[in-house]
Every structure is written in structure tokens, then in C-alpha cells.
């Protein structure tokens, strides 16, 4: 419906497992990470930009920032009755939000524009009262409430404007790759032997078969996190021993959450 509204063509991408694994490997190399959630979600963007490049598109618009600016994440609903806490958490998101689309766009030489991240628009969005960003409709609680209301005049708006929030990996189907790793990639014995070896030798905690595959792929390109001098700072992640350089609650290298960084004394 949205493509028709703007006179554009809607393209559906179908990706086989081996193709997805190649995409994930490139994401790991580009972003120096083996964080499963980041890899799955960023692979969605990678696949979309890659397809756009293949069909001759040179510029794309993204919705980056919408969830952060307008309280779109599902977990924020727990703060609905505590507006000061909701506002505090949304402001925290403003300070830590980062998106892979720019890096991926540069890789494919596709210009990425994110209207929500325009400085003037962000100032406007941040000035909107928090009570307008989360609200109730048809006995349900919704984030990005004011954005959804903007589409009420559209035909079939119920189907699109009031669509449930899903992570990119869920809405795209990329999350199904987890089953592949669990059932086809490693035997239980191989998995247990590998995670022990990696923990003992490289000081990295592996949490799943998927995580193991991503780490082994990461090691094709990079040293263990603790051996990368540029990552050694005052704080380090307790799960991977990599440098922890930001104010978020998870490690951007291994995906550990929640993280209490270790203060290094040497």
C-alpha cells in the first residue's frame, strides 16, 4: 500500500541460508562484532541495501531514530504509568542510539538519508511531550503513538499504522537462522569443547551455537578482543575482555547484556 501511495515498486527479497551466512560474515567484518542481535538485525539492512544497489537504486531513506525519538520499543511500555521514568529512559536512548545503515550504505556506495535524524527534526521530536509518544488505542498500549496517529487518514491505516512493533530480524524472518545454528551447525560435543577452549585460551564467554559461529567468523579477521591494543582502555567487558567505551548497557563487541564493565588497574 505504501509503495503504491508513492508510486514506487515494492520488492520482496528471498534469501537462502548460505546467502544469509555470507551476509552475516560481511557484517561481522564491517563492524568488528560477534553480537548475535546486532548481526541479525544489521544483516536485514545489508540485504536491503545490497538489493537496492543491484536494481540500480543510488539513494535510500531509512526510519532510523523513530523508535528512539518516539518511544517505539516494546520494553518502554513498562514505564507507561511512570512518565518521568519513561522520559528518562527515552533520553538515555537519544544519547546512545547508533545505526548500521550509514556504514552499509558507504560499503555499497548508496547514499543513506535518515529524515528522523535531521538536526532540526530531532530538536522538534525531543520537544514533544512524552505523553504524546505512548498511548492507548483499542485497549492496547502503543509506542510511536503520535506517528501512528499521522496515518489515520490513509486508506487501510488499521493494517499499517497500528502494526505491532517487531525487531527487524523478526519482521524479516532472519531470526529463523537461530534454529539452523542450533540444529545443524555444531554437535553438542563440538560446541562444549569449543566454548571451553575459547574461554580458557582467549577469555571469551560463548553463549550459544550461533554465538560460537559468529565468534569463529570474527576470528578469521581479528585477534581476540583482549589482544587488540586499540580496544584496551580503562574499562573492559567481563564476557569477552574487550574494551568497553560507551555508556550503553551491552557490549558492542560480544553482545553481553547487562554489562558491568571491569575497571582495569594496569
Please place each PLM-identified region on the residue numbering.
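A conserved beta-strand->alpha-helix junction
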Residues: 1-31, 59-64, 69, 120
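Structural element of the ATP-grasp superfamily
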Residues: 2-3, 151, 218
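Glycine-rich phosphate-binding loop signature in dinucleotide/nucleotide-binding domains
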Residues: 52-57
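Mid-to-C-terminal catalytic subdomains of enzymes
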Residues: 60, 65-82, 92-204, 227-233, ...
Amino acid at each position: 500500500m505504501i509503495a503504491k501511495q508513492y508510486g514506487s515498486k515494492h520488492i520482496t527479497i528471498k534469501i537462502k541460508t548460505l546467502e544469509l551466512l555470507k551476509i552475516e560474515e560481511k557484517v561481522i567484518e564491517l563492524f568488528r562484532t560477534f553480537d548475535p542481535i546486532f548481526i541479525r538485525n544489521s544483516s536485514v539492512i545489508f540485504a536491503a541495501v545490497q538489493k537496492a544497489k543491484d536494481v540500480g537504486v543510488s539513494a535510500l531513506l531509512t526510519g532510523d531514530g523513530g523508535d528512539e525519538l518516539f518511544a517505539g520499543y516494546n520494553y518502554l511500555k513498562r514505564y507507561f504509568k511512570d512518565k518521568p521514568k519513561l522520559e528518562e529512559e527515552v533520553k538515555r536512548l537519544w544519547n546512545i542510539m547508533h545505526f548500521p545503515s550509514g556504514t552499509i550504505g558507504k560499503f555499497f556506495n548508496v547514499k543513506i538519508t535518515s529524515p528522523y535524524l535531521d538536526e532540526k527534526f530531532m530538536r522538534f521530536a525531543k520537544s514533544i511531550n512524552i505523553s504524546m509518544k505512548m498511548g492507548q488505542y483499542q485497549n492496547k498500549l502503543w509506542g510511536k503513538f503520535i506517528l501512528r496517529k499521522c496515518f489515520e487518514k490513509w486508506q487501510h491505516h488499521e493494517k499499517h499504522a497500528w502494526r505491532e512493533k517487531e525487531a527487524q530480524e523478526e519482521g524479516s524472518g532472519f531470526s529463523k537462522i537461530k534454529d539452523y545454528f542450533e540444529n545443524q551447525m555444531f554437535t553438542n560435543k563440538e560446541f562444549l569443547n569449543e566454548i571451553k577452549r575459547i574461554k580458557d585460551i582467549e577469555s571469551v564467554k560463548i553463549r550459544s551455537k550461533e554465538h560460537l559461529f559468529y565468534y569463529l567468523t570474527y576470528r578469521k579477521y581479528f585477534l581476540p578482543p583482549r589482544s587488540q591494543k586499540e580496544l584496551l582502555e580503562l574499562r573492559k567487558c567481563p564476557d569477552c575482555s574487550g574494551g568497553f567505551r560507551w555508556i550503553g548497557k551491552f557490549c558492542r563487541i560480544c553482545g553481553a547484556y547487562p554489562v558491568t564493565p571491569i575497571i582495569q588497574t594496569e
